[in-house]
Amino acid sequence: MSDTTLAKSFEPQTIESQWGPEWEKRGYATPALDPSRPDFSIQLPPPNVTGTLHMGHAFNQTIMDGLVRYHRMLGHNTLWVPGTDHAGIATQIVVERQLDAQGVSRHDLGREKFVERVWEWKERSGSTITGQVRRIGASPDWSREYFTMNDKMSEAVREVFVRLYEQGLIYRGKRLVNWDPVLLTAVSDLEVVSEEENGHLWHIRYPLADGSGHLSVATTRPETMLGDVAVMVHPEDERYRHLVGRHVKLPLCEREIPIIADDYVDREFGTGVVKVTPAHDFNDYQVGLRHALAPIEILTLDAKINDNAPAAYRGLDRFDARKAIVDELDAQGLLESVKPHKLMVPRGDRTGVVIEPMLTDQWFVAMTKPAPQGTFHPGKSITEVSLEVVRRGEIKFVPENWTTTYYQWLENIQDWCISRQLWWGHQIPAWYGENGEIFVARNEEDARAQAAAKGYTGALKRDDDVLDTWFSSALVPFSSLGWPNETPEMKHFLPSSVLVTGFDIIFFWVARMVMMTTHFTGKVPFGTVYVHGLVRDAEGQKMSKSKGNTLDPIDIVDGIGLDALVAKRTTGLMNPRQAATIEKKTRKEFPDGIPAFGTDALRFTMASMATLGRNVNFDLARCEGYRNFCNKLWNATRFVLMNCEGHDCGFDKPEVCGAGDCGPGGYLDFSPADRWIVSLMQRVEADIAKGFADYRFDNIANAIYKFVWDEYCDWYLELAKVQIQNGTSEQQRATRRTLLRVLETVLRLAHPIIPFITEALWQKVAPLAGRYPAGKAEGEASLMVQAYPVAEPKKLDEACEQWAAELKAVVDACRNLRGEMNLSPATKVPLLAAGDAAQLQAFAPYVQALARLSEVRVLPDEAALDADAHGAPIAIVGGNKLVLKVEIDVAAERERLSKEIARLEGEIVKCNAKLGNEAFVAKAPPAVVAQEQKRLAEFQSTLTKLGAQLARLPA
């Protein structure tokens, strides 16, 4: 193999397009089920089939793929199951918009035809996100890919629903739910975004029924007063205690309602008197239950006033009704005041419409009802079991503080509304008789058999509703492994090893997986939950379409032009008026668009930012730095190949380093530099193993970066050049062997984080390093399934580490002297040195090369050095004294130093004036003040050095 076999520059797309499909074709991700090996498995949180990859996905999958590749290389039975979620609401909206563009509604098509259209769209577009997952280098077992609506997953969903119903843990009832009046469906809390908005607080007079006065009631939603069933005060509020039990007249309605007392009331809010509307407020609903107040619904499902309200308001939209009601209250003298008020407004994340609490018939899972006999945990509720397994340590949260959040949510849990008024999703397996009879069954045939057994022979109609998407997602830990069948995968990979997830879905997905898995399998779904932060922009702002700060990870990988980026950010905005602002911001931030960084640079960036529990403020500048790292690694490999190909690299003897083989006169004569880099490698390997164990991907990335860039490239390669040029054949052989073996180990170490570049380079390096599998031609083996490096303490060599530290200190001192004397890199001058003569002689060839010196002259003592220095700057390193012998014009040098000293003194005066100005320190951003303080310190340090130089010049 010649040195031209490795391209001159790193071209990510070429490598990615070759190796991504190749890994998949070879089936490396399919696990062996070897009972003698440890098992490692992980679930890919199924992305929406409608979706495209976002930065959160890219971050999450970098972490998961890093773990999977690491354990696969450790030789574990490793399974990563991929899948996509049918995403009920999101998918239905996409297809309905397509129909709207054709002037057709789903009701025009009918349910069956509409669902067919959704399946057609899924088949056309569903592979978009899985293709993007592949582009990020993810290596799950694609042969096991599932879709939450496929036959096997649907069977598991029906089985779970039927069993829970038979166990009395699923029921149908009328309860208050989040209702989207545009989509006309219940929605989960996760699909509701509450943000602070400017509103009003209306103070309304409710006359006492006996005519003796009135109560002033504060409300932010006057339209719902039509459904009031009481007004409420705090039981200890002296202002109103005497009125409890009496009645007020409900304005605009011909009803009297009671005055009740409840601890829920905040005496400091408004007047301390609030209205109670159980049918349209979650807190009021609980108050209504406590006080046995029958709710009165006053809104239709599309948020218009219904027939329970006075005739004047019927049919009005809720916000039109608000205006009409306020106007009428004002006309009747019942509107006391209107004040500006900030409040949290819940909006549907898909429609942007204000969500209404609505009383509707829905299906629920009982969260706190004890499970019956015959289940894995009889007498305990699914919530109770979910708390116990975490308290017992069967599931651990990383970072641990998320355990408290998990407890708080489960300890205050409400029954789970699992029905949705949609057409796309798992249709609820319940059939109704003509008189409201309910038959829950796995299929219609079973439902008819149930009905017949109960003496019902009439028509059956299936429930129109579908299940909450989170219901099927909660089953994934076991449904994706073949449940309800007992499969080998269930035995090996349940519980899975770790779940990697953002904190935003601990409640909606994580806890529900724990509930369902413990209830149906008796096992926990996973042993560890690694909770990471959210990916935000460089300023820490949440990435959102409306802010115009989103980044597409594929655009970072492939690059994108400015105009295309602007178009992507300004198309499909919920508020098109934001387009101009977003375009201006984008053109300023990315004047040349986004260059192609490649997958490895993106993954390295994500890993480096994965600190425990913190949000990730993604900065493209960091991405550029890691692309530079990839280039550095590529160029270092080219150097190693060019210096090792066709040479004796010390692999002719299969077994070396026996007695006398690895020292002076042996087959390999390893230098202290060779032993130092190998010793340091052991420490890095140990640090990386700890990083994986602790889920500290930032530490893993930093350890790889610092070792490769700061130690191997910046130091060892330079030392190796000297050894190859000046060493004996045994020393050259040892150096080449070390160059190759350390580089090959680096490629294996870094592979879980940067898989593509490491694979491409390993194909070239491993054969030379004697690490390519026997009998395999180049390209036939893969780094993906090689053994992961493990630290060998016996290779630690503290003496050589100390040797390297002292050599570095001498080289750095020489470089600093060159800087002080303004010597150009091309100017080579002699170094005079005195001190530890043996050490200095050993260091001499390295120092001469690395510090760009013409020679290194070791003098017998300091007196000889001082006599020869002629006032030149001196550096002291340990017991060694160093001086660069440069013939200088003393008068000219004195003048130059004096001018520079005067300039620095002037700069110091300016800095002190700024920092002494209280207004500047108080008003300037902290970063600006810190920068000024840093400038002052640098000026003072340089001034001290120049003063010492001036003092050393001969008179």
UniProtKB/Swiss-Prot annotation:
Binding-site residues for ATP, renumbered to this chain: 545
Q: Chief location of this protein?
A: cytoplasm
Q: Does the keyword Transcription regulation apply?
A: no
User: EC number(s) per UniProt?
Assistant: 6.1.1.9
Alphabetical keyword list: Aminoacyl-tRNA synthetase, ATP-binding, Coiled coil, Cytoplasm, Ligase, Nucleotide-binding, Protein biosynthesis
The reaction(s) annotated as catalysed by this protein in its Swiss-Prot or TrEMBL entry are: tRNA(Val) + L-valine + ATP = L-valyl-tRNA(Val) + AMP + diphosphate
> Which SUPFAM superfamilies has this protein been placed in?
Anticodon-binding domain of a subclass of class I aminoacyl-tRNA synthetases (SSF47323), Nucleotidylyl transferase (SSF52374), tRNA-binding arm (SSF46589), ValRS/IleRS/LeuRS editing domain (SSF50677)
Q: Please list the coiled coil stretches.
A: 887-953
Instruction: Motif 'KMSKS' region — list its residue ranges.
Output: 542-546
Instruction: Give the CC-aspect GO terms.
Output: cytosol
Top-level taxon in the UniProt lineage? Bacteria
Disulphide bonds in the chain: none
User: Which parts of the sequence form the motif 'HIGH' region?
Assistant: 47-57
Record has Coiled coil as a keyword: yes
Q: What is annotated about its quaternary structure and interactions?
A: Monomer.
Q: What does this protein do?
A: Catalyzes the attachment of valine to tRNA(Val). As ValRS can inadvertently accommodate and process structurally similar amino acids such as threonine, to avoid such errors, it has a 'posttransfer' editing activity that hydrolyzes mischarged Thr-tRNA(Val) in a tRNA-dependent manner.
Free-text comment about domains: ValRS has two distinct active sites: one for aminoacylation and one for editing. The misactivated threonine is translocated from the active site to the editing site.
What's the family?
Belongs to the class-I aminoacyl-tRNA synthetase family. ValS type 1 subfamily.
What HAMAP family does its record include? Val_tRNA_synth_type1
Name of protein:
Valine--tRNA ligase
Species, as recorded: Burkholderia mallei (strain ATCC 23344)
